[in-house]
Amino acid sequence: MERIALFIDGANVYAAAKRLGWNFDHRKILEHFAGLGRLYNAFYYTAVPYPMDDKQKRFIDALTYMGYTVRTKPLRELTDDAGETHRRANLDIELVTDLLSTVNLYDTAVLLTGDGDFERPVEVLRSKGKRVMVASIPEMTSYELRNVADEYVDLKDIRASVERPGYRLPSELRGAETRPFYVTAPLGAEENDADEERRER
């Protein structure tokens, strides 16, 4: 059976949800892509405020409980040329490190991101005989990344499998222009799902 590794760029997925106006269920994402074979591991990358607030801690705990390996990096405040301050953290290096250091443990890498910075790492994976699937939305996926992948999945096409039902983004966020590495707040209530699952056991 084909071994699957899942790598989720949390900021990019958050930005996609803002653009689409509906939210992703992280447990369903895990189940959907694990169904492609035998899941080796699922990595989730997200920036966090320092110190973390309770909501963010619950979100991280819920992801861990679901089976994700969560990588975090503290947000830093940066000032741009216009004098505006942004909170920012980039986890590209962490994702690429896991992607390449675990290469012998999977056959297919599934990347939930549209970031063109991953074009070269994907080329390296394919040169090693690995299959790479990229999943995102077209309007947020670089041409280079989409072109180099073995397969591209439009998240809108699998909405029924990965959406969190009954949850909609606030109207002011729907279709909002996004800056992927400036946003970190979780959109779902996965921590509530984890609590409910514990109670059922």
Label every PLM stretch briefly.
Residues 1-201:
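Terminal and domain-boundary accessory regions
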